[in-house]
């Protein structure tokens, strides 16, 4: 019986000529006459056992593919050009892909030009980018490859500080490609992370490129009232979907987002004041009642900073209170601060450089009702007076932007809305052009290079150019509206000495 001789790494395999002749695959068609010669056909780059498996498939249409042998069989099937086995191997690899092997499969797919495996491994890397940074192969990704991965719209990062940590870990292995840092968008980063990068001697150039990472864009949480029951909905920029998180039956409450949880603070239920605080995780939708505040109150002012929820002032029955207290996320004990100099409710509070600024609102007792314009600052564990606002305002909305405070006032006793800028370093107020007039609730938040205002429509105010954009939006029955980014960077005063500790803490929090 005639046979064809193959030599693989010095080992000989004799194959019946009839098997070669009957094979529909091009490789064997090309060598059908080669068996007449005495010399063996040398096969390079193929595993001996993998070639045996291919011969079994050609003969019996059966092949044993496992996660342990799939790569060597796939290589052989590509070289010998056996498409059905290639497909089986690729399906096996895709089925078994995970965060620990996706970079290796990504590199394998590039080496052999396997598009389906490339797409699947890329998808796995994108979905598990923080986990794959622990893979030794991560540092071997090229600059262009990592740029492509981190520029994907669905890359699984929830904050630009996380992107920064991924880049810093890669740069540690690739110090000649530090300019990859320029894919960052500084306006989405915390001041702490920007300072850390500066201390490392890295400079992020100003970019006009569009933001492609959906995960670093702002999430939105909205509470809308309907027949005394308010529905909480959450919008995720990664999924581009709105989901219902739950309901609340409170009125006159305040709310704030901290560590991906929505806190609902104080208010009234069935016309009775409450001092409880509820918390709902916006991802898991699980509710938890946290420790009660020190007293029953509504119309409090709230703000968050460094993982803490601050509750300031409020209305205790008919009397304004000066109580200020905070609760650290994940703990159960409220910590009291010194009382405000002037008790108030319905004012605004905002953090600037770890100092609390409180402004406006109403001071009331059983005999008095005073609309305030005064401003207090909590710094160095005490409240001090600052320059008052230009006018008295009972309803105030405030936001920090670029180290200063921007204030929009509501309408009660006033005839129109006002927009002010408080220059913190100069302790000085200036009045700015106000684009619209609106009677009713408003919601104000800082969004990178603009300030978002939800009133009778959606407005964007750009402080640097003092310009406005208007967008149609149904705002009926909205009780609360906020935009936020997920994951919070450990807050500290980063110095050359504390930098290694800070980066280590960030790596533990973000990349493990």
UniProtKB/Swiss-Prot annotation:
UniProt key word Transmembrane helix: no
Stated family: Belongs to the poxviruses Kelch family.
SUPFAM superfamilies: Kelch motif (SSF117281), POZ domain (SSF54695)
Ribosomal protein found in the keyword field: no
Protein name as annotated: Kelch repeat protein C2
Keywords: Early protein, Kelch repeat, Repeat
Limits of the BTB domain: 2-67
Kelch repeats: 216-261, 262-307, 309-354, 356-403, 405-449, 452-498
Family annotation (InterPro entries): BACK, BTB/POZ_dom, Kelch-typ_b-propeller, Kelch_1, SKP1/BTB/POZ_sf
């Amino acid at each position: 019986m005639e046979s064809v001789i193959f030599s693989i790494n010095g080992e000989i395999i004799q194959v019946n000529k009839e098997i070669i002749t009957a094979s529909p695959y091009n490789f064997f068609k090309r060598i059908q006459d080669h068996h007449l010669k005495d010399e063996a056909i040398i096969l390079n780059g193929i595993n001996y056992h993998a070639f045996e498996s291919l011969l079994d498939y050609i003969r019996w249409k059966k092949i044993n593919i496992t996660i342990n042998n799939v790569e060597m069989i796939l290589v052989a099937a590509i070289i010998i050009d056996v498409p059905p086995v290639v497909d089986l191997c690729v399906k096996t690899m895709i089925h078994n892909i995970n965060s620990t092997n996706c970079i290796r499969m990504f590199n394998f797919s590039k080496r052999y030009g396997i598009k389906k495996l490339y797409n699947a491994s890329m998808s796995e890397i994108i979905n598990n980018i923080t986990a794959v940074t622990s893979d030794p192969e991560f540092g071997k990704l090229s600059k262009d490859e990592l740029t492509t991965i981190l520029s994907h719209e669905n890359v699984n990062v929830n904050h630009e500080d996380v992107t920064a940590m991924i880049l810093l870990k890669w740069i540690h292995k690739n110090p000649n490609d530090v300019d990859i840092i320029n894919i960052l968008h500084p306006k989405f980063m915390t001041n702490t992370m920007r300072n850390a990068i500066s201390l490392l001697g890295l400079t992020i150039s100003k970019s006009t490129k569009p933001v492609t990472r959906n995960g670093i864009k702002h999430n939105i949480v909205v509470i809308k009232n309907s027949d005394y029951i308010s529905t909480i909905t959450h919008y995720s920029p990664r999924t581009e979907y709105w989901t219902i998180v739950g309901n609340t039956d409170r009125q006159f409450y305040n709310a704030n987002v901290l560590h991906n949880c929505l806190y609902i603070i104080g208010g009234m239920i069935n016309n009775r004041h409450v001092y409880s605080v509820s918390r709902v995780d916006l991802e898991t939708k699980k509710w938890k009642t946290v420790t009660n505040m020190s007293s029953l109150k509504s119309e409090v002012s709230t703000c968050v900073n460094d993982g803490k929820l601050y509750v300031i002032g409020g209305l205790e029955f008919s009397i304004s209170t000066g109580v200020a207290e905070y609760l650290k996320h994940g703990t159960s004990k409220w910590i009291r601060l010194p009382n405000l100099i002037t008790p108030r409710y319905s004012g605004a509070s905002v953090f600037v450089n770890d100092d609390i600024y409180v402004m406006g609102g109403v001071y009331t007792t059983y005999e008095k009702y005073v609309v305030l314009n005064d401003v207090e600052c909590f710094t160095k564990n005490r409240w001090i007076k600052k320059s008052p606002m230009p006018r008295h305002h009972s309803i105030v909305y405030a936001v920090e932007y670029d180290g200063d405070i921007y204030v929009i006032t509501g309408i009660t006793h006033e005839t129109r809305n006002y927009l002010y800028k408080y220059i913190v370093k100069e302790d000085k107020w200036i009045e700015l052009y106000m684009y619209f007039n609106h009677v009713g609730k408003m919601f104000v938040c800082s969004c990178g290079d603009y300030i978002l205002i939800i009133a009778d429509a959606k407005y964007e105010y750009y402080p640097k150019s003092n310009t406005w954009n208007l967008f149609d939006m149904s705002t009926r029955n909205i009780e609360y509206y906020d935009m936020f980014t997920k994951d919070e960077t450990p807050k500290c005063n980063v110095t050359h000495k504390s930098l290694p500790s800070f980066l280590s803490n960030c790596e533990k929090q973000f990349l493990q």
